[in-house]
A protein has these predicted regions:
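Active-site-adjacent pocket-lining segments in enzyme domains
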Residues: 1-134
């Protein structure tokens, strides 16, 4: 699992960092899942990983992402999107929802609930705005 965090204050330079982008592309070949949080979705898009995928990003940056990547399907009003091996999230404190979702997906509801209790988060996937593409 590769986790791509927010690139706040470094987004422009990160999107020009060929070493990092090539690393993400290389890891993508064998990764079971790649998650992005906040503006980390821009890195996935720049690496070409979100072509023909549905994604999201930090709410106030959705329009910026749509302008930069006009051919991508970028959703708003959701906390995370799971499409294939990619899970993109709105980020911030809401990154926990995407992480708990992946834990539930991989290990079951009981494990996700146990983890959420340790984080003092009321976890119920049915109450989390999200999109899952099959």
């Amino acid at each position: 699992i590769l986790v791509v965090p927010s690139a706040e204050h470094h987004l422009d330079t990160d999107l020009e960092d060929e070493v990092m982008l090539n690393f993400v592309k290389k890891v993508n070949k064998d990764a079971e899942f790649i998650t992005s949080h906040c503006d980390g979705a821009f890195v996935l898009a720049e690496a070409g990983l979100l072509k023909n995928k549905v994604s999201t990003t930090f709410p106030t940056d959705i329009e910026k992402m749509r302008k930069r990547y006009p051919n991508l399907d970028i959703r708003e009003d959701v906390l995370f999107v799971h499409d294939g091996k990619y899970i993109t999230s709105a980020g911030g404190a809401k990154s926990f929802e995407a992480a708990l979702y992946l834990c539930e997906y991989l290990y079951g509801k009981n494990i996700a609930e146990s983890l959420s209790a340790g984080l003092v988060i009321d976890w119920d996937l049915a109450n989390v705005a999200h999109v899952v593409i099959k």
